[in-house]
UniProtKB/Swiss-Prot annotation:
Domain Response regulatory positions: 613-730
Induction note: Not induced by ethylene.
The protein's assembly and partners: Homodimer; disulfide-linked.
UniProt protein name: Ethylene receptor 2
Length: 736
């Protein structure tokens, strides 16, 4: 039997029931949709710490929705089954609700702590945002610094550097004005040198001792200063509030080796002043990163300015060096011109002096061999010795000139070393005998008899050194000793740079000349080897000499890779001259092309040349006559001519010797020699060709030999010298 517990509803109640039906339906739909949404988003979330709470909460919502849905059938008469379902649903909802409420007691504190952590994370996020802002600011500052550094370093012109700095700072920091004050040369004022908006700023100056300037110069970073300070009054007067102003010092680095002319004389601490102004009537202020940017740029400008100063000074030094090089080159050319003029003058004087000397020596030697009374013979010998002394003096001057310009070369040949020493002693002994000096010669047992070197220069050294010993000795003795020097005897402690090296192909000749003469004052040692310098002691003032001997000897010794020095214990205690020269050993060098210049045998001195046909070519009639006289005296059949053309016309195979003056005008002697070779062809059919010259240079000798001449004779020529020349020609076919 059905149970009907409800009374029939009125029409108004039916309307209310419809609204309740609709409300319960939508409540149920909402309750059912919420768990679906929760499940969807929880699955999308990677981390969710309260999944069981979510399950309980979802069950609670679903049961609540179920009660509202079941309630649709309980508003009208219903069966017992519906009542049981409704009761079960409500009981389940109550159980789940209580369990969820109990669980929330434990969860709510965690949820509150989550909120706290959320606030903490928000604070951390804000702090990270600030740090990121600082990093971005630093990166931006670094970018500006790199950009400014690149612009500044792109040039080394300091005006461009400073102008670029102001322009780039103005663009980067959006400045209204930027100015640079440089110290004046006096260093007591700062002068306005560069501004951002004025191409040619008026040179305002302010005292460097102003408090605001001292404040900036004493700080290591940019400093805010008053917009009304003296260095900041660069903007036009307006009613707007002026923007903030900062100033920073720019170190002018001290450069000890460089000084720019239009910069001040820098002290160890000298600064320029850079002033930067923000736009007027703006609320903008200077930030820390902007001030840091200004500091970095100031340091970069200081470095760039130092580089620019170095470059400017280097360019100035380069220009000065170029000017000095031009002046030196001009001086060198003038010196070379002077040397050439001197050499030309000496060459001309040498030739012009030797030509008349040739006549004096030749005629004096002819007179010497004639029948003369003792007084006449003495006068002739005096004339001959004086002429030879004059010739020696000319040779000394020419040799010294060539030694100084490096044109003198050794005439190397094979010679008899023993004969050379004996000849020197034979020349010195007559002078020593007059002064009653005892002269001795000592040659070591291992002393080589034959050597390779310049015999003439070695004899000149010996004659000078031994001659000085005789000249400055009034009594006593002069001893000459020569040894084949060993390593221990080659060292002079006063000349450590002289370090000879022994070899199998060479040996070192050590000559010592000791006398008992006037000695040497220690203060005169530095002047001994200077040209035209002589000992100033009273005992030696009257001694003859030009002061060239030892100077030339030293240069000859140096050419022979040797060393020369003089020792003396003082005035009146004598002196010892020692020299070492390097000579070659025959048989161990390739001396096949070296001439042998040993002395001629004595019987050559007595030879006559009766009937020897000789042709003499000289355009100087006086010199031609003198040469002819010498040859006629020797018994030669002499023909004289004055030109090269005449020589080639007259010269025949009957002529055995052709003597030509090397300085003949017109067809010169070289052309004549070449023509003679062409005319006669074979060597045995042509005459022997000899040049007679007053030029002592090696070039003349080489030119003569190059064109096929057989020898060169240097003026002046005595009868003995002419006899030796002819003997050498006829015996060896050459004379050097």
């Amino acid at each position: 039997m059905d149970c009907n517990c409800f009374d029939p509803l009125l029409p108004a109640d039916e309307l209310l029931m419809k609204y309740q039906y609709i409300s319960d339906f939508f409540i149920a739909v909402a309750y059912f949709s919420i768990p679906i949404e929760l499940v969807y988003f929880v699955q999308k979330s990677a981390v969710f710490p309260y999944r069981w709470v979510l399950v309980q909460f979802g069950a609670f919502i679903v049961l609540c929705g179920a009660t509202h849905l079941i309630n649709l059938w309980t508003s009208t008469p219903h069966t017992r089954t519906v009542a049981m379902v409704m009761t079960t649903a409500k009981f389940s909802t109550a159980a789940v609700s209580c369990a969820t409420a109990v669980m929330l007691v434990h969860i709510i504190p965690d949820l509150l702590s989550v909120k706290t952590r959320e606030l903490f994370l928000k604070n951390k996020a804000a702090e990270l945002d600030r740090e990121m802002g600082l990093i971005r600011t630093q990166e931006e500052t670094g970018r500006y610094v790199r950009m400014l550094t690149h612009e500044i370093r792109s040039t080394l012109d300091r005006h461009t550097i400073l102008k670029t700095t102001l322009v780039e700072l103005g663009r980067a920091l959006q400045l209204e004005e930027c100015a640079l004050w440089m110290p004046t040369r006096t260093g007591v004022e700062l002068q306005l040198s560069y501004t951002l908006h004025h191409q040619n700023p008026v040179g305002f100056t302010v005292p460097i001792q102003l408090p605001v300037i001292n404040q900036v110069f004493s700080a290591n970073c940019a400093v805010k200063i008053s917009p009304n300070s003296a260095v900041a009054r660069l903007r036009p007067t307006r009613k707007y509030i002026p923007g903030e102003v900062v100033a920073v010092r720019v170190p002018l680095l001290h450069l000890s080796n460089f000084q720019t002319n239009d910069w001040p004389e820098l002290s160890p601490k000298s600064y320029a002043l850079m002033v930067l102004m923000l736009p007027s009537n703006s609320a903008r202020q200077w930030h820390v990163h902007e001030l840091e940017l200004v500091d970095v740029v100031a340091d970069q400008v200081a470095v760039a300015l130092s580089h620019a100063a170095i470059l400017e000074e280097s360019m100035r030094a380069r220009d000065l060096l170029i000017e000095q090089n031009v002046a030196l080159d001009l001086a060198r050319r003038e010196a070379e011109t002077a040397v050439r003029a001197r050499n030309d003058f000496l060459g001309v004087m040498n030739h012009e002096m030797r030509t008349p000397m040739h006549a004096v020596v030749a005629l004096s030697s002819l007179l010497q061999e004639s029948e003369l009374i003792p007084e006449q013979r003495l006068m002739v010998e005096t004339i001959l010795k004086s002429s030879n002394l004059l010739a020696t003096l000319i040779n000394d001057v020419l040799d010294l000139s060539r030694l100084e310009d490096g044109s003198l070369q050794l005439d190397v040949g094979t010679f008899n070393l023993h004969a050379l020493f004996r000849e020197v002693l034979n020349l010195i002994k007559p002078v020593a005998a007059v002064k009653k000096l005892f002269v001795t010669l000592s040659l070591s047992s291992d002393f080589p008899e034959v050597a390779i070197g310049d015999e003439k220069r070695l004899m000149q050294i010996l004659l000078n050194v031994v001659g000085n010993a005789v000249k400055f000795s009034k009594e006593g003795s002069v001893s000459v000793s020569a040894v084949n020097a060993k390593s221990e005897s080659l060292i002079d402690p006063r000349a450590p740079e002289f370090f000879p090296v022994q070899s199998e192909n060479h040996f070192y000749l050590r000559v010592q000349v000791k006398d008992t003469g006037s000695g040497i004052n220690p203060q005169d040692f530095p002047k001994l080897f200077c040209k035209f310098a002589q000992n100033q002691e009273p005992a030696t003032k009257n001694s003859a000499g030009t002061g060239l001997g030892l100077a030339i000897c030293k240069r000859f010794v140096n050419l022979m890779e040797g060393h020369i020095w003089i020792e003396s214990e003082g005035v009146g205690k004598g002196s010892t001259a020692i020299f070492i020269v390097k000579l070659g050993i025959p048989g161990r060098l390739n001396e096949s092309k070296l001439p042998f210049t040993a002395g001629l045998p004595a019987n050559h001195m007595q030879m006559t040349f009766q009937g020897l046909k000789v042709l003499v070519m000289d355009d100087n009639g006086f010199s031609r006559m003198v040469t002819k006289s010498l040859l006629v005296h020797l018994g030669c059949d002499v023909t004289t001519i004055g030109s090269g053309d005449e020589c080639l016309r007259i010269l025949t195979r009957e002529h055995k010797v052709l003597i030509m003056d090397a300085s003949i005008t017109g067809m010169n002697c070289y052309d004549v020699a070449v023509s003679v070779h062409e005319k006669f062809g074979k060597r045995l059919e042509r005459p022997l060709i000899v040049a007679l010259t007053g030029n002592t240079d090696q070039v003349t000798k080489e030119n003569c030999l190059r064109v096929g001449m057989d020898g060169v004779i240097l003026k002046p020529v005595s009868i003995d010298k002419m006899r030796s020349v002819l003997s050498g020609l006829l015996e060896h076919g050459t004379v050097l």
